[in-house]
């Protein structure tokens, strides 16, 4: 059975499951230097993504479209051969608590002139299916809890077991977009717009909050506003909770929440307000989960899956993992909507086969497209050992290898790599990427040596937790250390067949340092570079490596 999952709205993507094997997931932003978060605009793009994955539209046995905004049913719009069409899809959240995987049936998906029927699962179900079916819990047929916290919903807790998927409770009445909304009121990204948000804002704020300090006076003000506007018994709070499925109402009330905070702590440093808000929500997550576990007793699983856009918050993930509440915590490398096409396909798999694991690799994105840079760039043969020597001499390199990563993190296939031993390298990379000074640069590290350098230094292959840099290494690898002494670590086995692992081994031989700086290889506001020519046209790093060829441009004025 070949299933094709489709995410038509922002973070558009096309995923193909052949039986239980993930063949590919093609995210629109990772094609032709598209804008980040790009939706699927035309059904021809579905055909193109399938072609890149080795399929024709007629090869697919079942199409599944991700659900979207709507209390009962929802509609998504896209262009086709006959013009603009609206497709009926499932709502964002399941209609009934015990029917998480109930499908909406549809027709009229026209691809290359042929109509296909489809079905659609609730958006939240896609998050549940994608995270559980990729987890170690599924492999060992273990029960698990699943925390789903996405932009437009409150954090929702489910239990996954042989009996299926059971909704337990919402943890507290705050939408995931509250994090981005905070940035409209405080900090360097303030914006008077109260009707929308930028999808990249939450990640930037997570970096900026490390410049602030948690303040007890601000905590008290946040608690007061939280009760007055979201969780308490005031008319505004009660009305907000009654209309929780209305995204416009939720957004308006969330902004009122921050407006009152601003009044209560007028004059307080804004980076402290943001840092305190972050910690306030972190404690809410831990304490409400503690309450649910205590209420259920020993029968509730102590395995936790985290999904939804808030699953990209590495500090919350780390706090939950270290809380002592859970035996194990799993976050997939695509917890946000970049994994929704996979989730849609997995929803149909679960409906047919049960809660089974899929066979998958994080390197299942688009293949590197063959291209030739312009005449200003010179290509020469370059083995990984030679590239390691170049890095050891202090040069950053755009590193392109094989198929792209799934999800938003560059994990060594579409990366800019650089030595971490020079403190100025972080500033150099941030300048090349046109980013603010407080933005961190992550390390990619050989996993057997990670505990030597980081606390806890555990095996974290997808850059979804933060670690503290140990004192003895802070001066040896300063470029990967964030302002608060942390690092968003990605580990990789030295025995991995991936070229980036082999490069790290060669670099370690030369320097006795088992890590490099790793940041995404992309132009500002765009997805990963799809080919060498794109990286060279961007031109803000003078060296580009792919398939054992090093392309060099030592004279371009764009290079900072």
From Swiss-Prot:
Keywords: Nodulation, Transferase
Position of the signal peptide: none
Transferase listed as a keyword: yes
EC number: 2.1.3.-
One matching Pfam family: Carbam_trans_C
Superkingdom of source: Bacteria
Any one Gene Ontology molecular-function term assigned to this protein's record: transferase activity
Family matches, as InterPro entries: Carbam_trans_C, Carbam_trans_C_sf, Carbtransf_dom, NodU/CmcH_Carbamoyltrnsfr
Key word Transferase present: yes
GO biological process, one term: biosynthetic process
Function according to Swiss-Prot or TrEMBL: Involved in 6-O-carbamoylation of Nod-factors.
Family, as annotated: Belongs to the NodU/CmcH family.
Protein name per its UniProtKB record: Nodulation protein U
């Amino acid at each position: 059975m070949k299933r094709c999952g489709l995410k038509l709205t922002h973070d558009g993507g096309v995923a193909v499951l052949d039986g239980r094997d993930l063949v590919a997931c093609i995210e629109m932003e990772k094609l032709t230097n598209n804008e980040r978060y790009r939706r699927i605009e035309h059904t021809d793009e579905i055909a193109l993504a399938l072609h890149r994955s080795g399929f024709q539209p007629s090869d697919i046995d079942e199409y599944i479209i991700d659900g979207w905004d709507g209390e009962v049913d929802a509609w998504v719009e896209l262009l086709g051969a006959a013009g603009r069409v609206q497709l009926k899809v499932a709502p964002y959240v399941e209609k009934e608590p015990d029917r998480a995987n109930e499908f909406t049936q549809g027709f009229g998906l026209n691809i290359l002139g042929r109509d296909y029927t489809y079905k659609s699962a609730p958006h939240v179900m896609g998050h549940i299916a994608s995270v559980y079916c990729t987890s170690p819990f599924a492999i060992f047929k273990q029960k698990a809890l699943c925390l789903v916290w996405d932009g437009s919903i409150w954090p929702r807790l489910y239990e996954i077991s042989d009996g299926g998927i059971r909704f337990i409770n919402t943890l507290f009445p705050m939408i995931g977009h509250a994090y981005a909304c905070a940035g409209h009121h405080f900090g360097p990204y303030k914006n008077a717009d109260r009707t929308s948000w930028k999808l990249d804002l939450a990640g930037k704020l997570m970096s900026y909050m490390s410049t602030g300090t948690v303040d007890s006076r601000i905590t008290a003000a946040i608690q007061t506003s939280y009760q007055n506007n979201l969780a308490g018994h005031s008319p505004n709070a009660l009305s907000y909770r009654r209309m929780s499925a209305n995204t416009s109402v939720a957004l308006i009330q969330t902004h009122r929440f921050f407006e009152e905070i601003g009044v209560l702590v007028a004059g307080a440093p804004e980076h402290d307000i943001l840092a305190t808000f972050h910690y306030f929500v972190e404690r809410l997550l831990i304490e409400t989960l503690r309450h649910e576990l205590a209420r259920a007793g020993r029968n509730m699983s102590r395995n936790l899956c985290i999904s939804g856009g808030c699953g990209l918050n590495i500090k919350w993930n780390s706090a939950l993992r270290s809380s002592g509440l859970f035996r194990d915590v799993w976050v997939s490398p695509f917890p946000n909507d970049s994994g929704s096409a996979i989730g849609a396909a997995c929803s149909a798999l679960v409906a047919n086969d049960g809660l089974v694991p899929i066979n998958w690799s994080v390197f299942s994105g688009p293949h590197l497209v063959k291209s030739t840079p312009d005449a200003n760039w010179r290509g020469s043969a370059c083995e990984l050992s030679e590239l390691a020597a170049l890095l050891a001499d202090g040069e950053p390199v755009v590193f392109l290898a094989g198929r792209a990563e799934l999800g938003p993190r560059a994990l060594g296939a579409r990366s800019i790599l650089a030595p971490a031993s020079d403190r100025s390298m972080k500033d150099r990379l941030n300048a090349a990427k046109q980013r603010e000074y407080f933005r961190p640069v992550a390390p990619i590290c050989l996993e057997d040596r990670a505990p030597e350098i980081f606390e806890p230094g555990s095996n974290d292959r997808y850059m979804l937790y933060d670690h503290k840099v140990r004192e003895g290494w802070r001066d040896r690898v300063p470029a990967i250390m964030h302002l608060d002494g942390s690092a968003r670590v990605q580990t990789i086995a030295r025995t991995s067949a991936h070229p980036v692992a082999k490069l790290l081994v060669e670099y370690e031989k030369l320097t006795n340092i088992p890590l490099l700086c790793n940041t995404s290889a992309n132009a500002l506001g765009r997805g990963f570079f799809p080919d060498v020519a794109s990286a060279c046209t961007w031109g803000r790093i003078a060296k580009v490596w792919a398939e054992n060829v090093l392309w060099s441009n030592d004279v371009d004025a764009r290079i900072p």
